[in-house]
Amino acid sequence: MKLTCVVIVAVLFLTAWTFVTAAPHSSNALENLYLKAHHEMNNPEDSELNKRCYDSGTSCNTGNQCCSGWCIFVCL
């Protein structure tokens, strides 16, 4: 019974702490996300969603991720 109460209090405390510490940053993060999405709507060719392969020097797992088709930990 005591352990259950301690766990419940700990979860409530951590939840409250998360909301208190994240509140000032979360609104700014959403604003930056909105501005980036708005920029991509105005310039669709600049959108990262259109990129289907990685440029040389970018880390990779398989060769089919790289534009060149060659991957040795980084795109060649």
From Swiss-Prot:
It comes from the Eukaryota. Expressed by the venom duct. Keywords: Calcium channel impairing toxin, Cleavage on pair of basic residues, Disulfide bond, Ion channel impairing toxin, Knottin, Neurotoxin, Presynaptic neurotoxin, Secreted, Signal, Toxin, Voltage-gated calcium channel impairing toxin. PROSITE patterns: OMEGA_CONOTOXIN (PS60004). GO terms for cellular component: extracellular region; host cell presynaptic membrane. Disulfide bonds join 53-67, 60-71, 66-75. The keyword Signal applies. It is found in: Secreted. The keyword Metal-binding does not apply. It holds the Pfam family Conotoxin. InterPro entries: Conotoxin, Conotoxin_omega-typ_CS. GO terms for molecular function: calcium channel regulator activity; ion channel inhibitor activity; toxin activity. Residues 1-22 form the signal peptide. Residues 23-52 form a propeptide. Coiled coil: none annotated. Omega-conotoxins act at presynaptic membranes, they bind and block voltage-gated calcium channels (Cav). Belongs to the conotoxin O1 superfamily. The presence of a 'disulfide through disulfide knot' structurally defines this protein as a knottin. This is Omega-conotoxin-like TxO2.
